[in-house]
Amino acid sequence: MGFNVIRLLRGSAVAVVLAPTVLLTMLSSAERGCPKGCRCEGKMVYCESQKLQEIPSSISAGCLGLSLRYNSLQKLKYNQFKGLNQLTWLYLDHNHISNIDENAFNGIRRLKELILSSNRISYFLNNTFRPVTNLRNLDLSYNQLHSLGSEQFRGLRKLLSLHLRSNSLRTIPVRIFQDCRNLELLDLGYNRIRSLARNVFAGMIRLKELHLEHNQFSKLNLALFPRLVSLQNLYMQWNKISVIGQTMSWTWSSLQRLDLSGNEIEAFSGPSVFQCVPNLQRLNLDSNKLTFIGQEILDSWISLNDISLAGNIWECSRNICSLVNWLRSFKGLRENTIICASPKELQGVNVIDAVKNYSICGKSTTTERFDLARALPKPTFKPKLPRPKHESKPPLPPTVGATEPSPETDVDTEHISFHKIIAGSVALFLSVLVILLVMYVSWKRYPASMKQLQQRSLMRRHRKKKRQSLKQMTPGTQEFYVDYKPTNTETSEMLLNGTGPCTYSKSGSRECEIPLSMNVSTFLAYDQPTISYCGVHHELLSHKSFETNAQEDTMESHLETELDLSTITSAGRISDHKPQLA
């Protein structure tokens, strides 16, 4: 009994002693599993954008993925990743790596994805990738590679995609990809490659996509690719290719897309260029220097469902007719911006419209071009006159170099004029609608001002009606009026003698001026006779005739003149007696 108790005490004592050691070991392993400044998600370690110049040494041995992107690493040392046996992917892009040791990737045989893009690597040793034979994806793009070793990718038999984009490669060694039998994507775009050897792609029996765009190829020979029996997409846009040829009789049945846009292709070397690609579905020939395409080439495009031909220098002559006829019968996708570049009269006109409107493909004998002056469409404003019916005559022989305009042009002009009429009527309707809307809004927002406008308009109408009624009431006969303007001599004689000669003018106008009734002040301070309007311009009343008004006015004027003369004579006598009294 006592021995059992002692044993239990001893066991508990051992446990108490070992517990701190176990805890310290666990803490140290935890600290080693996630380095300082990094982010750990399970067995994935992300040490990104930390300006690291060295790879942390405290990374857990069970790490499956390590990302060291956007740091300042400059080189990879010998056995740099020793101890990371479980690592399956490694991201080292966007660093300053310029030197990689030949044995830097020792000990990570399970690695499947290696990203070294956007660094400063200028070369690789032949044995650099030998320890990572299980690679599936290798990205070496955006570096400064000038050349590749002949055994650079030896042993990478499981590689599926290889990216060498945006480097400075000028040549590709022969059979460099011979061990890459499972490679499906090869990207050699944006380099300085001028030519390729025939055995460059030897062994690549499963390649499906090949990028050779933005290089310096001057010609393309489809005989370079007979070993690429599984290739489906070939990208060779934006090179300097001017000629496409085929020097080998073989059938490339796997190719489905060919991109040759942005080159300098002027013509095809022979009618059998595209006969070796019977299953071609998508062809890009835009932005080249093609002027026409022969009927033999068009006949070889038997399986196309998408074509791009814009941006070429198409010559709209009879040579273009075969292409236009083919485009009209083509049922796939195509661009409608196929524009004429010559002759000068048709620059900027759509090729199909030019052939349709100007009868380029009409019957002609010797010349190919058409006479533009005879082929111009008729103006829309010219009226159509009925054609007289003549007796049937034998047809005249066609003139050389001229074609009769097609009747389709008249139909087009009729459609254009009809559309203009519709557009004008719609514009007129919209303008009227806007005016009504403005009036309605102003009526709702400013009702007082609208009422004032209505009252003013009613007053104007009332005045207008009143004037018309007065005009109807005035007599139509013309009356004569006397205009009397006395002179200075006549005035003095009238003052002294009481009578004197006078002159007056007789006129037949309704608007006249007569002198006012004269009094003493008028004669004493006389500069110009004061005038007033006659009574003709007063409104005529229906119960009072004009003659009575005139008689009353004359009687009043006579009375006023008699009074004035009496006052003048009395004033003269008083002035005569004054000197005598003096």
Curated annotation (Swiss-Prot):
Cytoplasmic side: 442-582
Topological type in the membrane: Single-pass type I membrane protein
Residue ranges occupied by any LRRCT domain in the UniProt entry: 312-363
GO biological process: positive regulation of amyloid-beta formation; positive regulation of synapse assembly; regulation of presynapse assembly
GO annotations of cellular component type: glutamatergic synapse; membrane; postsynaptic density membrane
Mapped LRR repeat ranges: 63-83, 86-107, 110-131, 134-155, 158-179, 182-203, 206-226, 230-251, 254-275, 279-300
Subcellular location: Cell membrane; Postsynaptic cell membrane
Tissue: Expressed in neuronal tissues.
Transmembrane segments: 421-441
LRRNT domain span: 31-61
Keywords: Cell membrane, Glycoprotein, Leucine-rich repeat, Membrane, Postsynaptic cell membrane, Repeat, Signal, Synapse, Transmembrane, Transmembrane helix
PANTHER family for the chain: ANTIGEN BSP, PUTATIVE-RELATED (PTHR24369), LEUCINE RICH REPEAT TRANSMEMBRANE NEURONAL 3 (PTHR24369:SF218)
Functional note: May play a role in the development and maintenance of the vertebrate nervous system. Exhibits a limited synaptogenic activity in vitro, restricted to excitatory presynaptic differentiation.
Protein name: Leucine-rich repeat transmembrane neuronal protein 3
